[in-house]
Amino acid sequence: MAGKGGKGLLAAKTTAAAANKDSVKKKSISRSSRAGIQFPVGRIHRQLKQRVSAHGRVGATAAVYTASILEYLTAEVLELAGNASKDLKVKRITPRHLQLAIRGDEELDTLIKGTIAGGGVIPHIHKSLVNKVTKD
């Protein structure tokens, strides 16, 4: 019977230690800050789980990788659009600047083939339409 008393005493000590640990709670760190990126890893992970057909099973690193790719592409497009707006001496990036930036870059143009609302058209005059100056 002495064995039971010892186990009860040990259980009381562990519950007291667990209660003490709960009172000193660590501050939660987001997965985005752990990965060193700005895009929300948790939100992207949730959205990936909603779209996958394998019973919502998505690896933890898949969301981090996807978020970092999206952040890189966004930074690339914004940098090119900012350069386009700076060339036109305007402080605000418009859909026209996005259009000029995306269509000006060959790789982004192949990636983003859709129409950008309010983007206008890319200025281009075909060679055959240009008047040729002839010397007489």
UniProtKB/Swiss-Prot annotation:
GO cellular-component term (any)? nucleosome
Q: Where in the cell is it found?
A: Nucleus; Chromosome
A Pfam family assignment: Histone_H2A_C
Q: Which is one GO molecular function term here? A: DNA binding
SUPFAM superfamilies assigned to the protein according to its UniProt record, in alphabetical order? Histone-fold
A biological process from GO? regulation of gene expression
Q: Which residues form a coiled coil?
A: none
State the UniProt keywords alphabetically.
Chromosome, DNA-binding, Nucleosome core, Nucleus
Disulfide bonds, paired cysteine numbers: none
What is the annotated role of this protein in its UniProt record? Variant histones H2A are synthesized throughout the cell cycle and are very different from classical S-phase regulated H2A. May replace conventional H2A in a subset of nucleosomes. Nucleosomes wrap and compact DNA into chromatin, limiting DNA accessibility to the cellular machineries which require DNA as a template. Histones thereby play a central role in transcription regulation, DNA repair, DNA replication and chromosomal stability. DNA accessibility is regulated via a complex set of post-translational modifications of histones, also called histone code, and nucleosome remodeling.
Q: What's the family?
A: Belongs to the histone H2A family.
Q: What is this protein called?
A: Probable histone H2A variant 2
Recorded source organism is Arabidopsis thaliana (Mouse-ear cress)
